[in-house]
C-alpha cells in the first residue's frame, strides 16, 4: 500500500492571518499539483490532516481533484513537533492513504519509515509537494517511489 506525504501549501504570515491559512500562491500550487496527481491517476482512500487551517485547506483542494471515497479527516499526532516515531509505530496503513502535514514532522516520519531513523534527513519537502512511499519487493521498509514538487531547483 502506498503512503502519500504532502506538506501543506504556502501559508499567509501570522500578521495577515493568525490561523495561517493558505496564501493565494500556496492554494494555486496545491491545485496545480492536485491536477497533475489526478491526471496520473493517483488514488487514495482517505486524506488525513492535522486540523491546522493550512493543512485542512490543502487536504480539501487535494480531495476535490482526487475524490477519496472516505473523504478528508482530521487525525492527531501529525503536528509540526509531534513524535514521528510514535506515530509510525501506531499507524496502520492498509489502503493507499494521504497525510497532509507539516515540517519537521513529515520529513522525520519519512526518514523513520524509509531508513529507520527519524534524525537522518533523506528528502527535502516543499510546500504543496507530494512524496509517494511504497513497498519494494523483498524489503521490509518502504522506498520513495516518486515525488511531485511545485518548484524545481
Protein language model regions, located:
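Active-site-proximal alpha-helix that buttresses catalytic centers in soluble enzyme cores
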Residues: 2-82, 106-107, 117-118, 124-128, ...
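Short, solvent-exposed aromatic-acidic interface loops
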Residues: 145-153
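Active-site-adjacent alpha-helix immediately C-terminal to a catalytic or transition-state-stabilizing loop
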Residues: 85-141
Amino acid at each position: 500500500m502506498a503512503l502519500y506525504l504532502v506538506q501543506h501549501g504556502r501559508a499567509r504570515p501570522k500578521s495577515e492571518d493568525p490561523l495561517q491559512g493558505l496564501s493565494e500562491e500556496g492554494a494555486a500550487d496545491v491545485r496545480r499539483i492536485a491536477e497533475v496527481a489526478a491526471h496520473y491517476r493517483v488514488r487514495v482512500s482517505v486524506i488525513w490532516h492535522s486540523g491546522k487551517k493550512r493543512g485542512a485547506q490543502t487536504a480539501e483542494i487535494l480531495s476535490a481533484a482526487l475524490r477519496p471515497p472516505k473523504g478528508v479527516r482530521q487525525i492527531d499526532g501529525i503536528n509540526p513537533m509531534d513524535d514521528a516515531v510514535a506515530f509510525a509505530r501506531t499507524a496502520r496503513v492498509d489502503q493507499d492513504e494521504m497525510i497532509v502535514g507539516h515540517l519537521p514532522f513529515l520529513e522525520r516520519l519519512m526518514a523513520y519509515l524509509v531508513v529507520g531513523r527519524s534524525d537522518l534527513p533523506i528528502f527535502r519537502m516543499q510546500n504543496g509537494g507530494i512524496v509517494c512511499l511504497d513497498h519494494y519487493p523483498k524489503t521490509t521498509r518502504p522506498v520513495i517511489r516518486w515525488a511531485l514538487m511545485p518548484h524545481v531547483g
